[in-house]
Amino acid sequence: MKTVVNSWNEWDPLKHVIVGRADDCHIPPEEPALDAKVPEDSDMRGQWGRRPQETIDRANELLDNFASLLEKRGIRVDRPTPIDFSKPATTPDFHTDSQFGCMPPRDVLLTVGSEILEATMSYRCRWFEYLCYRPLMEKYWEEDPNFRHEAAPKPRLTDRDYRADYLSEKIGIEKRLKWTAEKFFVTTEEEPLFDAADVLRFGKDLVVQHGFTTNQRGIEWLRRHFPDHRVHAVNFPGDPYPIHIDATFTPIRPGLILNNPQRRLPGEQREIFYKNDWEIIDAAQPAHNTPPPLCYSSVWLSMNVLVLDPKTVCVEKSEVYQAEQMDKLGMEVVEVELRDAYAFGGGLHCCTADVYRESSMEDYFSTLSG
């Protein structure tokens, strides 16, 4: 299959995708951005180092099976090249004793049209993660003359990028919710920061979550970088750990979005969707009461689905309520076992990154042009 980089939204027919790997994945050491994400009662507090080999093997088995399933449906699948994540991440501004992994390419790579943009990232342990994808980027650049490989300015990630008061006391859930409602996050506005997984693509419009991993300067950088797009900042006050939008707000097809019922989009931010005949409905409840062991993510990875086309969606096999909801919405559900890989970086949307969808830059919000 000839390489063509082209993807403008989250739902048009998927023809080429990157699926991550779990090789050598580490629980990184404590650092400012990471500590604020890990709840006080989490089993990950105080733990760091290489994940147990049997869990790595199991995660890779599931990721390989997912890749094979996609290939059997006629979708080209590429995989990253893991680096040695046991090595420290060191720059003139910071040092952390190990890195993370390359299971979730969605965090690092943002595909907009014929461009793949490497995000800044906001964790020190993930500063060099882009290297896992460089062999693929080089290959695409050679094979597709229209492909644009871009990288956002690498942040310094000094202590000035983080609020020390996020870590200075044992912070209860009520205080966290108050802070996030006030858009008071662990990251400051020292320099532009964004993770690619905070961005959803709606043709001419990009919806970007302001939270722990993406700040306002990062959103403004995206606005200037994509001058032909409209960039909309959103936030979800019900989320005490707002990191990455794709377990909170999930477009399924033109006109339909699932919203996490515990993290509803504020009323004034819904107007652009309602005025353009988009329906926002509550996602089904997760099938699990707790996340898997040693997992950063919440139980709401249930709604972290991968849409293959406007009528077909991949849902994690154990998430029976989400699958039932998708079925009632008229979607063909493809069950994919992945829960034992969640701890390595997320769900079905997280562990993939688009290369090619049969799509174009359509205007889905024409009543609010400009």
Label each region the model flagged.
Residues 1-370:
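The feature marks the mature, well-folded catalytic cores of soluble enzymes
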